[in-house]
């Protein structure tokens, strides 16, 4: 009985080691040693819509760091993976250009310990105007005071299922509103007429 238990323990250990050895770190990302695909982390503006099954682990024993990789439901696993924090990794050399997306839906989310969708924008005219203002407008400066309401707009495209392109929406006490990307620190003043069409709850 003890021999069987020991064999089971050894097999479990080998499985864990094998899984953890699948990914190696590189100067620019992670290498899947089984498929020989190299994945690079995208900017925080890109998020996985959900997390599927685990595909591998990178373990840095020296620093005690572990990164677990997962497939993204409905997304092409040969191109995109995610981790336990929802970060997106891409096997392509070039980051997706969200300005070229045919955006079909925008989730309006409240961000706290978890992200909760409070509204859903499916009106094509509103979606197109949000995209136009964000991608085509000149950069502005955020007000110095804190926003009274903060939402995260998650844009979805049928061309990239399972993946969101995200920007923040800040509403201030004086009624002004801004789109904002925390990674690039790009801020865009939202026209009042458009702000009235963005549901906050």
Outline where the language-model segments fall.
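Function-determining sites in protein domains
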Residues: 20-201
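Positively charged n-region of N-terminal signal peptides that target proteins for export
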Residues: 1-10
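C-terminal motif of bacterial Sec signal peptides marking the signal peptidase cleavage site
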Residues: 15-18
